[in-house]
Design a protein with these regions (language model features):
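N-terminal loops that bind phosphate or other acidic moieties
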Residues: 1-192
């Protein structure tokens, strides 16, 4: 993501949700107070300059960066094709909020992920009444949580689509199993 993307995302989310921008930019108790004070002066100035902007596309034009605009387009297109969306980070949440104001059903295709413990992300997830798929306590860059959650999502999809149901329980005779599965049978029998 680009420099300033979290601040831009905080402005977008603040305007669309009436959540105070300060709650979205504060990363945690260790954030430098002088840095926060300066940031708040700049962000409040941007909010004041665009105080009458409320429509999603206008909010995007006033506060969003290029990367947020691209994500809004990708989210809308992916949801229109019923693709799964992995949402990770404040800029992705801002893009999703904009997309949801344009076409609300996009949130039906979302799995929320988390790469760090930024307090502003807590506020953003609360706006969607969502929690992250996994809370790993990482302090990494946006997207890491989605990358780590992807294998879990793939496994869940496989369970839903590939596991035999009650009508077709699969092979009943060990001889009809592929070689690796036959070798695993004695090990499975030894488990408590």
């Amino acid at each position: 993501m680009g420099v300033g993307s979290h601040e831009s995302a905080a402005l977008v989310l603040s305007r669309l949700t009436d959540c105070p921008v300060r709650d979205l930019v504060v990363s945690g108790p260790d954030m430098d107070t002088d840095q926060l004070a300066h940031m708040m002066v700049v962000l409040k100035g941007a909010q004041g300059r665009h105080r009458e902007v409320v429509e999603p596309v206008e909010v995007l034009a006033a506060f969003g960066g290029f990367e947020v605009a691209v994500m809004v387009g990708v989210i809308l297109m992916a949801a229109s094709k019923r693709h799964l969306l992995m949402i990770d980070g404040l800029p992705a949440c801002a893009a999703l909020m904009l997309a949801a104001r344009i076409a609300q059903p996009v949130t039906d295709y979302c799995v929320f992920c988390r790469s760090h413990n930024h307090r502003g992300l807590d506020q953003a997830l609360n706006q969607f009444r969502a929690s992250a798929l996994r809370e790993l306590g990482m302090d990494s860059t946006d997207g890491t949580g989605a990358t780590l959650a992807w294998p879990l999502v793939k496994c869940a999809a496989a369970l839903l689509t590939e596991v035999a149901d009650g009508e077709d329980p699969g092979p009943t005779h060990p001889g009809s199993l592929p070689e690796p599965a036959r070798e695993a049978l004695p090990f499975g029998d030894s488990l408590p």
